[in-house]
Amino acid sequence: IVSRVEDATRVAAAIERLSVEQSTVIRLSFIEERPHSEIAAVLGLPLGTVKSRIRLAMNRLRDLLDDAT
């Protein structure tokens, strides 16, 4: 259980280091579990832009988490 809490803390800290655009789509997609089409509608963005931001944000998160270990 401690490891899960530590992992969640690391991920939350990494999300805070993302750009506002990236952290917003990550929160909406993975924390609020909204579909990409809904995120696009809420943010007033094309679906492709939302998918691209999620992909880029995930890549950045991986880099941040790899650097932290």
What feature does the model see in each segment?
Residues 31, 37, 43-68:
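DNA-recognition helix of helix-turn-helix
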Residues 25-29:
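A short pre-motif secondary-structure segment
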Residues 2, 40-41:
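Short coil/turn segments at secondary-structure junctions
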Residues 17-18, 46:
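Histidine kinase transmitter module recognition
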Residues 3-4, 18, 35, 60:
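Exposed, low-complexity/repetitive linear segments and helix-based recognition motifs
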Residues 21-22:
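The N-cap/first-turn positions of alpha helices
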Residues 1-16:
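Acidic, proline/glycine-rich intrinsically disordered inter-domain spacer in sigma factors
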